């Protein structure tokens, strides 16, 4: 059995404040950084995954590998939890009292979710991010221990009432994958077919989102044409090429927009916690992504057929082995920057970034000060197998500034 906790004593800079101390309290001297050893699943293939290779998501691919890695408990660090930002770290932690009854009956009531929870969460994003528009694409509920009960069928997009924790390191979309979903929206049917027209959004919100979406796509198309990239080319059985699929996001002058997940536990998390990667740390710049291109058919409110792309996280090069981890030598850390919130409560809401057009614009200017996305995954800690099943929810939300 893996050891559950590894305690490391570090000397922290004197100007750090404690996330567990009153405002203004300065930690003196030693700070104990708490880490656990977690079990992580990675895609470990060296090539580009084949189109629609859903065995990677199902966990049956021969290229998937399990690694035992250290995970830092954010509560043990001197950094206040409220100071993490999606622009610097890839994620934020927002405190919000539960806006709805978190009972299973309540959260599985579609009308309660769309008419009460959705508006509360989009208002939260407008408040904390300063976005002028935020629209929910969909939500997922995770409240079963594993996939054995329902079977995993990624082709239907997990359109089932209860899901298990998703335990493979990933970010939901590559930049082209996020744009693929955004461009697939079919006007004017999208809100009606996703049951978010009545009670979930207002007439001005819907009109603003669709108008800004058209402006965004027009600005992207101008930048793509200026870069000399030809139109998108689709050949059955092959990954798409051209158009926004070959564009790096630079020289875009339209409204800034992003794609986020709002991740919340309905009860205090006792097992299968969510790990997030701190993208502000230098080691995170070495993370490699494997693009898993997928086809989507007959999705509500979308064009009949389109492509998107998931970003599967590869293990760091020094770590490509069947299991375990090795301490680094020569001062160069090889440990991924995984962290988590121990016993995360329903009031502690993660905001995870999937995509940010501004990050790509800055990258095109040679600036690396804004994070594009946040890798994340459920992971397992030995000894927690018999704890209550994790009950959680994630909303995928478009934000436009």
Give the residues covered by each predicted segment:
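Aromatic side chains
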Residues: 25, 40-43, 117-118, 340, ...
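Residue-level preference for alpha-helix termini and adjacent loops
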Residues: 39, 90, 140, 172, ...
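Non-heme Fe(II) oxygenase catalytic core, chiefly the N-lobe of the double-stranded beta-helix
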Residues: 13, 74, 78-307
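Short, intrinsically disordered low-complexity segments
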Residues: 3, 32-34, 212, 293, ...
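Fe(II)/2-oxoglutarate
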Residues: 2-103
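Polar low-complexity intrinsically disordered regions
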Residues: 1-3, 10-22, 196-200, 321-332, ...
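Small/flexible residues
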Residues: 6, 35-37, 67-68, 215, ...
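Catalytic core of Fe(II)/2-oxoglutarate
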Residues: 310-311, 315-401
């Amino acid at each position: 059995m893996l050891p559950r906790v590894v305690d490391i004593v570090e000397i922290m800079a004197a100007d750090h404040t404690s996330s567990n101390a009153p405002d203004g309290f300065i930690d003196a001297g030693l700070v104990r950084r708490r880490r656990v050893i977690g079990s992580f699943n990675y895609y470990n293939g060296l090539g580009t995954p084949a189109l629609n290779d859903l065995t990677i998501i199902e966990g049956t691919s021969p290229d998937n590998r399990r690694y035992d890695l250290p995970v830092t408990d954010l509560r043990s660090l001197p950094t206040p939890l409220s100071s993490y930002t999606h622009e610097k770290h890839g994620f934020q932690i927002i405190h919000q009292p539960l806006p709805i009854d978190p009972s299973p009956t309540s959260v599985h009531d579609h009308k309660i979710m769309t008419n009460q929870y959705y508006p509360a969460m989009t208002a939260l994003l407008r408040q904390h991010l300063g976005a002028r528009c935020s629209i929910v694409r969909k939500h997922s509920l995770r409240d079963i221990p594993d996939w054995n009960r329902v079977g995993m069928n990624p082709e239907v997009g997990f359109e089932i009432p209860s899901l298990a924790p998703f335990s493979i390191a990933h970010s939901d979309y590559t930049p082209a994958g996020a744009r693929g979903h955004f461009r697939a929206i079919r006007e004017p049917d999208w809100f009606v077919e996703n049951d978010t027209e009545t009670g979930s959004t207002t007439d001005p919100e819907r009109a603003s989102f669709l108008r800004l979406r058209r402006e965004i796509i027009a600005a992207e198309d101008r930048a793509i044409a200026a870069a000399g990239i030809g139109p998108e080319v689709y050949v059955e059985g092959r990954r798409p090429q051209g158009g926004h699929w070959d564009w790096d996001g630079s020289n875009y002058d339209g409204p800034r927009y992003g794609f986020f997940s709002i991740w919340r536990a309905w009860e205090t998390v006792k097992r299968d916690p969510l790990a997030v990667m701190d993208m502000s740390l230098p080691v995170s710049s070495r993370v490699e992504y494997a693009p898993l291109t997928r086809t989507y058919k007959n999705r509500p409110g979308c064009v009949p057929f389109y492509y998107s792309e998931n970003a599967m996280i590869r293990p760091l090069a020094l770590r490509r082995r069947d299991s375990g981890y090795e301490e680094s030598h020569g001062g160069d850390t090889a440990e991924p920057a995984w962290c988590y919130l121990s016993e995360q409560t329903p009031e502690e809401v993660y905001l995870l970034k999937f995509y940010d057009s501004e990050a790509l614009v800055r990258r095109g200017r040679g600036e690396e000060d804004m994070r594009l996305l946040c890798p994340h995954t459920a992971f397992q800690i030995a000894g927690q197998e018999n704890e209550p099943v994790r009950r959680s929810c994630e909303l995928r939300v478009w934000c436009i500034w």
